[in-house]
């Protein structure tokens, strides 16, 4: 496998059904957009100034942040919003196409994670601000796409989404920037505190993982992820894992060479399930991680902080 393809996902949406879907919707969407257009002015009519920015995010991890920063001056919709949805294999719906065609700001994860967003944007036509998080943070296609597990990337996104909404609604620029500062310094306070605490107490401790979703987080926490990278990539891609990697991981678990096992519960293969069972049998704590908000109505910071606290508790247990 070439290095550039190392993180590419395992299933692509079915283009034929998607193209049929979009072709049947575009004319209706354009007409609907015309019907929603503001008055053109004239005697007795007030000049139109957009005060609610329409934002569509591919994933609710980014949509949650956008909604909190946008506040009363943003209407944010997330396409993938259910913990039961596999983001890697998602296929857009008619409603997704309509929402994106009407959006003033579109947010996509990029890095090959949501290629269906590119097709929706191409079909939507019109003009809008598109915020590709992968491009924003400098992770090229073929890199690890689980960007929301990097605190540094999250910080870059909060600034970018505030500025994107301010470009659409410049009259409320100060409002968006105030809310961004509040999100960074207040809403994320517990999240940042737990990250700092884990790093201070447990940096360098060995952990295992089921999939590449844990890579950025382990780096931020200073934890030593000892699972073979080739295994993490294979599970992410949905390709066969090597026998050598399975032997290595089985030995790590059997010898209690890891303090915690981090499981991506949205991509749990038979190999991963066997490792989880073995870890529990060896009294190694298993901590659940996910790719979308859990529960679905949680905020980004509540979801991440809950996972981090579970990890901190597991690490404390192994060092009691």
Task: Kindly give the residue locations of the regions a language model identified.
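N-terminal secretory signal peptides that target proteins for export/translocation
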Residues: 1-15
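Bacterial N-terminal signal peptides
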Residues: 13, 19-33
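Short, low-complexity intrinsically disordered segments enriched in A/P/G/S/L with frequent Arg
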Residues: 15-16, 46
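Extracytoplasmic metal-acquisition and chelation regions
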Residues: 23, 34-320
